[in-house]
Amino acid sequence: MPMSLRLHNNLTRRVEPFAPLDPSSPTLYVCGPTVYNYAHIGNARGPVVFDVLAALLRRRYGALRYARNITDVDDKINAAAQAQGVPISTITDRFAAIYRQDMAALGVVPPDIEPEATAHIPQIVAMIEQLIANGHAYAAEGHVLFSVSSFDGYGKLSRRDPDEMLAGARVDVAPYKRDPGDFVLWKPSSADLPGWESPWGRGRPGWHIECSAMAAAHLGPTIDIHAGGVDLQFPHHENEIAQSECAHGGATFARFWLHNGMLNFSGAKMSKSLGNIETVHELIARHPPEALRYALLSAHYRQPLDWSDGLIEQAKNTLDRLYGTLRDLAALQADSGNDVAPSRTIPVEVESALEDDLNTPLALSVIASIASEARALRNELVHGGEPSTRMSDLHAVHAKLLGAGLALGLLQQDPAAWFSRGTDAGDDARITALVEERSTAKKAKDFARADAIRKQLAEEGIVLEDTPQGVRWKRA
């Protein structure tokens, strides 16, 4: 097995060697969306980053049990349904489907398991009953609450002192709570809200218990890696630990905790409450989704990422160069009669970068270096290099570049598809025909016609490139 995989464990605040409890079946749980609205681009950072992690774990161990939940019962969902005058399922079904489509557009591979909270009510009720039986929860006025003071480990993830938390001005002190910091496991539902029968009356679960119950149902009482946004560290993840460990006799809930940093927009955290969001759905309508993925991977996952139009443009330009390199490599090999599709072998340098706490910026710099090597080799061949030996080198570096991209979920499109920017094949054919007409006009010394075509294409945002293999075009 290659060098050890090292991950920053937020539980210990250290980068540590990772090894799963069961090497034949590592487990990963990622907090998923609450489906009441479009996901903003900040919500997509975790799924993209942990998609890279999931692929790395599969390569390393040959298997993975990866769960990412759907929260489909929540007060925000109820409010959205009431505001729009539609059934709750209309809201949740619509936005769950859109979320899956948006993630697919970003190249995020679906998790193995995508549990929905409403499909796990029996497991949630059973876990709450166990917490009551173990002396960690109590019923009051149709509610069930977790007793924070009953768990000595409360605050170990967020490093918050329980007494300081209780003194916080934002703690909601309801009359049925024994202590201000106790949090809801079950709440009563009125007739107009979703609810299920339970030992405590008709009601619905709190948000935190949903993840604990779903993780246990599908991955067991102890999971290898729990991941999510740093904004979920407290109270959500802290409460998950308390519930899960108290329900399972003190068994460690998650061995490693990974948290991705927030996206900032104009210097402020991107959030729905601040109204400074850009939704994934809107962005993928305006930009190539792969450029968004590249941008999300351009900073280390634990660091904040300043999101801007300039960052997206930079990602587009970089991918233009990389796909241009791939296109030129393929064309040169085809011209030489060696157009066998290269294998995609992930370079050791890229794998090593990812095994160092998912260092995607370093992996991207390795990709840039491979592309530079490929361009230099191509230029050498075009300008009189030794074809018999160097063509095999070109084929190898082509495979290396594709493999490097594969590790990050990048560079797997046909270059023509990338440069088409999602336009239809008919328009591509029209542009290609104009480019060929311009070449014919130049050969016939009809420079007026050739210049007119170039001007027309430029107005359409088409850039022409003269290469030894002929004129190629791309969209600006």
From Swiss-Prot:
Q: Which GO terms describe its biological process?
A: cysteinyl-tRNA aminoacylation
Q: Give the record's keywords alphabetically.
A: Aminoacyl-tRNA synthetase, ATP-binding, Cytoplasm, Ligase, Metal-binding, Nucleotide-binding, Protein biosynthesis, Zinc
Q: Which residues bind Zn(2+)?
A: 31, 211, 236, 240
Q: Where in the cell is it found?
A: Cytoplasm
Q: Which GO terms describe its cellular component?
A: cytosol
Q: Which Pfam families match?
A: CysS_C, DALR_2, tRNA-synt_1e
Annotated motif 'HIGH' region, positions: 33-43
Note on cofactor: Binds 1 zinc ion per subunit.
Question: What's the cofactor?
Answer: Zn(2+)
Q: Where is this motif: 'KMSKS' region?
A: 269-273
Q: What are the EC numbers?
A: 6.1.1.16
**UniProt-recorded name of the protein:** Cysteine--tRNA ligase
What's the encoding gene here?
cysS
